Regions:
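Periplasmic N-terminal accessory/gating domains of Gram-negative outer-membrane beta-barrel systems
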Residues: 40-117, 122-130, 147
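Short strand-turn segments of transmembrane beta-barrel domains in outer membranes
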Residues: 110-113, 121-132, 140-171, 181-183, ...
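Transmembrane beta-barrel wall of Gram-negative outer-membrane proteins
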Residues: 161-185, 200-237, 259-283, 317-320, ...
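Structural signature of Gram-negative outer-membrane beta-barrels, strongest in the C-terminal barrel
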Residues: 231, 320-324, 330, 363-478, ...
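Membrane-embedded beta-barrel scaffold of Gram-negative outer-membrane proteins
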Residues: 282-286, 292, 415, 422-423, ...
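Surface-exposed extracellular loop regions of Gram-negative outer-membrane beta-barrel proteins
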Residues: 340-354, 399, 414, 418-456, ...
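Gram-negative outer-membrane beta-barrel transporters
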Residues: 382-386, 475-477, 498-581, 674
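C-terminal beta-signal and adjacent terminal beta-strands/loops
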Residues: 562, 571-591, 608-612, 616-677
Length: 677
């Protein structure tokens, strides 16, 4: 009850003070103009930008996958998927928001997002120097908004492709009330059947992913909107690692059944109040239960459970001339439990060789309870008709590390000409340390939050009604990052310290054409450099996600009312990697060999390039709207190398061993089908 009281006290102060402040300002005006009407409109259609993202070729209708066609965004795991890395930051540095609420589970293990494409209303990517409404992030922010349900006769939409199938049910219930519910399930298990064996690996639990989203919304009168939400997703799979496999030959500790089972389930409620045309108040609350279980080797396992509660309060007003004021309060509460019987490896994504950081097998149970509080204010101030300034501040505190931050943030936009604007943005940021580094038994409970400072500047030019271009430069200074302590050092018991820093800098250019003459598209190019510095040795090395240049091109053409075609081309410099320059006996299994690595991230993979093409045919089946989508992934069949690894065959010696390349996805045809009843 004490925590609940503390939670609502700042909220009451925010709402009451802003209401009083706005009333006093408005009372000074001589003339009062009030627009009477329904202010709680349901937002049921996607934005134009989202529709364009959904049409990008080769993404199976997944608009979040389309963000990898934007400047400065790459997959952390190459063609194998993984979360996005933005402008030289770690994927863990990003924050994801869905309908204003923070979430961690937004991509499946194979890289596709957890959202039904028919439910997305808007996607915003803030790649750097984002505003005060976002916190607990030092990289970038993905803000995803799902659309509201449609008050219509009951409708069922079914879609299927070679990769997944799904169903969406939507319609009105009572007056001013409507709902939708979506469920999707992957079809990967049809291509990777149980019992299939290759190179000593046998599938015993074919990989499956599924997800669901649901909303029930009640428009109360003209000024209130009450929305209940359900969200969830899961991924699972299992494989047997035998002595004959490469993994088994390298490290027999992994011989046996290996499986993963991860899921999350979320329930939430949001109340929006529009008491006046200039005022909006929002209260959002949700509960998220995230669970993960990994089993491998001879009885080794790692299980985790995160019981999370989120509360967000927001008040906004435009009653003060030339100002849009926002005040908000956030509370994020975590109860994280980690159970394990495993051989730990104490390393980070900037360690040269995790094998050298191998610890002794340990069993135990660890727990982290953390409450993260934030209070923020923001003012968008129209200084002149051509000059806009945004000033914000965000105060954050967490009761685990006991750290408090005050983060100032600002931006300035100047319209030099009606079609040309210059802008600059800056801010400071922090995030809670990685859980693995903060655990008391396997990490350092005294590890501190990671910090960053962002600055960016650029220009936008509306060339014509249909053509526009944008250029931007940026710099990210990263500090207090986690550094793995050498297990042979005198302070090895610390495991991790805040002795790593880094920088990421670059320039990006985008030219975009809006729909005209039956086609639209964009071309982007970027140059960047991302480095990390060991603050103890003062050695600076390139970050493994450092991608000096990236080029993306997207185009879609409407042939007629039935046919659309599109293409996406991506090319980029290869990722950094640490080369293997030899092998050595495994100290725990002398008859087996481990790879011996050279200088950290000192080599570069070959250039990556990929062309995806797609055609969509719209028609009717017995009066019902339907569509067929034909796609060809990696149409040119480029052999994109994603890494190199030591491939033992049982006959290797230190003078005779095989290093093999790992390739990304080859030519892959796909077909999709969608029908609405």
């Amino acid at each position: 009850m004490m925590n609940q009281s503390k939670t609502f006290t700042p909220a009451c102060l925010i709402f009451s003070s802003l209401t009083l402040f706005s009333s006093l300002i408005y009372a000074d005006k001589v003339e009062k103009v009030e627009v009477v009407g329904q202010r709680n409109q349901a937002l049921t259609t996607p934005t134009l930008a989202t529709e364009k993202l959904m049409a990008v070729a080769g993404i199976d209708g997944d608009p979040l996958a389309a963000v990898f066609s934007l400047p400065g965004v790459v997959y952390a795991g190459g063609d194998d998927g993984g979360e996005p890395a933005i402008r030289g930051s770690s994927p863990n540095d990003n924050a994801f928001y869905v309908d204003m609420m923070p979430t961690d589970y937004i991509f499946h293990l194979f890289g596709d997002s957890i959202f039904n494409k028919n439910l997305l209303r808007n996607i915003e990517l803030d790649a750097a120097a984002f505003g005060s409404q976002y916190g607990n992030a030092t990289g970038g922010v993905f803000d995803v908004r799902l659309r509201d349900p449609k008050a219509q006769p009951l409708e069922v939409k079914f879609n299927a492709s070679l990769l997944k199938t799904g169903i969406l049910v939507e319609g009105g219930t009572f007056e001013q009330q409507a709902f939708y519910f979506s469920y999707r399930r992957s079809l990967i298990h049809l291509f990777l059947a149980e019992g299939d064996e290759e190179d000593g690996l046998t599938i015993f639990d074919a990989p499956v992913s599924d997800d669901y989203q649901g909303k029930y919304q009640w428009l109360i009168g003209n000024n209130h909107k009450l929305t209940f939400t359900l969200n969830g997703a899961s991924d699972s799979g299992g494989i047997n690692i035998s002595e004959a496999s490469e993994e088994g030959r390298i490290d027999p500790d992994f011989i046996g059944d290996a499986s993963i089972d991860a899921r999350f389930d979320s329930q939430g409620v949001q109340w929006e109040w529009f008491p006046h045309q200039d005022d909006t108040y929002t209260v959002s609350f949700n509960h998220v239960l995230s669970e993960s279980s990994e089993k491998y080797g001879a009885g080794q396992f790692e299980t985790s459970e995160d019981n999370e509660f989120n509360l967000r309060l927001l008040a906004q007003t435009t009653r003060l001339n030339q100002h849009k004021l926002s005040l908000g309060f956030d509370l994020q509460s975590h109860d994280f439990t980690y159970s394990f019987d495993a051989i730990p490896y104490f390393c980070t994504d900037h360690s040269a060789n995790c094998d050298e950081q191998k610890g002794e097998r340990i069993q135990g149970k660890d727990n982290i309870k953390a409450n993260i509080y934030a209070l923020y204010a923001n003012d968008v101030w129209q200084l002149t008709p051509s000059l806009t300034m945004e000033l914000g501040v965000r105060t954050e505190h967490d009761d685990y590390t006991k750290k408090t931050f005050v983060h100032p943030r600002a931006s300035l936009t100047w319209y030099v000409l009606p079609q040309v604007s210059l802008f600059t943005k800056t801010g400071t940021y922090s995030r809670f340390p990685d859980v693995g580094a903060a655990l008391s038994m396997l990490g350092n409970p005294k590890i501190q939050p990671y910090e960053a400072r962002h600055i960016s500047a650029g220009a936008e030019w509306q060339i014509t009604d249909h053509w526009q271009t944008k250029a931007e430069i940026y710099l990210k200074d990263l500090s207090q990052l986690a550094r793995a302590v050498d297990i042979d050092s005198d302070n090895a018991e610390l495991r991790y310290t805040n002795d790593l820093s880094g920088t990421a800098k670059g320039i990006e250019w985008l030219i975009e054409k809006e729909l005209s003459n039956n086609w639209y598209g964009w071309l982007s190019a970027s140059w960047s450099k991302s480095e990390r510095t060991d603050d103890l040795t003062q050695i600076t090395t390139e970050y493994y996600l450092d991608t000096p240049w990236i080029v993306n091109a997207v185009a879609n053409y409407k042939i007629n009312e039935r046919w659309d075609i599109g293409l996406r081309y991506s090319a980029r410099s290869g990722a950094k990697y640490t080369p293997i320059n030899g092998i050595k006996p495994n100290p725990d299994f002398p008859d087996n060999y481990l790879a011996q690595y050279g200088e950290l991230n000192s080599d570069t993979l070959p250039t990556y390039s990929r062309l995806d093409i797609q055609a969509k045919f719209q028609y009717q089946i017995f009066g019902n709207e339907a569509a067929l989508t034909f796609a060809l992934i990696n149409a040119l069949g480029n052999e994109n190398i994603s890494g190199y690894y030591f491939k033992p065959d049982g006959n290797e010696t230190p003078d005779n061993f095989d290093i093999t390349s790992e390739e990304g996805v080859g030519i892959f045809p796909s077909i999709g089908f969608e029908v609405t009843f």
